[in-house]
Amino acid sequence: MTNFTIVNGQIYTPGLAIVNAPQPYTPLGGDTLHISLDVSGNGQLSLTPDDDEPTRFHEITIFLTSSETERNFTVSNGTVPEILPFSSDSDSDSSSNQTAFTTAYTGPILSLEPGSTVKHINWVWPECFVGNGDSDDQGARGTYNISMHQSFRWNETDYYTVFDLSISVSNGIEESDERVECELLENEYRPGLSEESNQDLPGQPFVGDGVETTVIDGQDNGNEASGSGFSKALRWVVVGLVMGVVL
């Protein structure tokens, strides 16, 4: 079960990143998986921090994982991806085909859109997600977690946390030359990976007392409850299994 704490439509993770999109349990498809992250704590963090800054990011990596399909795909692993050519068809005139370029995964997230406090990840769905609804040839479509791994320092203490944001790959995804083979992105599925993150965060860095929050209970798949910040007991389980305000 994963609970999600939401303030004004933003999802606060057990870390420094704040998720603008997608919302929990959203059915997704289309050309790309779009993820929007605020990496400034809504203006409280420097985009170019000093090495000895008491609160700062080290790295964010993202994977798409599923216990249903037992698959694990790289969205961004912190490295610069290889640029891959593909043939771009031009309407009906095959003689005017041009070579275009794509990448299998997204580059280092904190380096995207330099100078911007919001990072937009547009990950092209690989071939095995092509289909509509539950129909596909390779069995990849279904329920997934956007698994966000954060390495960061908060108040002079270093942490490594894993946060799972549940979505479903159930909307239509059409064939495209831009889609890469899934084997290029696939990693070993490790269901116990989040358990390796074994530190408890003492709170959420950017949600204080008196802030009106909405907690979506993952066990009930979307039931909501409201609360007032962290004025009562709060416990973040860093492994991403339980998140939210304990009222």
Predicted feature residues:
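C-terminal GPI-anchoring signal of eukaryotic secretory precursors
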Residues: 193-238
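Structured recognition/catalytic domains enriched at protein termini
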Residues: 2-145, 149-198
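Fungal secretory targeting signals
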Residues: 1-11, 227-247
